[in-house]
């Protein structure tokens, strides 16, 4: 019904190098909005957006879901319809700031010890070693691991910006054991045993939570806790914040357009917190 509109959204989004998942989310949000308004495209106004988003807010949806709708419809109005859009009139929903869950080094060690599956153990170690997202660890390839430079190459991450992050000695040992015992994969580093393709994020989240439960961790944990813990432990060890931001692939807080990158030479001077697991 709205295929021509979706094609325009895809074309405009691709020109801006947006990820496929973002484009899909934009199209879904716009479809919900258009079905709700049931108006001709030419007759749409920002009042229609305000009514739609207000109803969504009153329905009790989360700030994250609300802002997904907001982003998709905003893109549609500004880039496709070429209509004026004032963020002061149609603001995003503010999210409650919650402190991320950070695991201690002892807790991370316990989780690793409670993970009998060698592939799963290698993935958990890799996520903590370099602060990887789940989507990043599942898409690693054999060639992304540098034994000599002790780095992990993250390709096309969430921000569509390649980066290098840290490979701890302990992680390299686990990866080496996994590689020799699990078929010496040369393509995808952690392929699905069933399909040979990339593992799903849900499967990684599930086995991590099972390992945390076996380890007796009482905190509410997710795989993202490993990323938070990586950053927190580096900061505690005195690592410069700008290097932590670069290792995580975050944008510079002073500019949403510029990324901070760390050279391989600089990486050689930073130790992964996994290499400090000898004590708290």
List where the protein language model places each region.
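Conserved catalytic core of the tyrosine transesterase superfamily
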Residues: 1-280
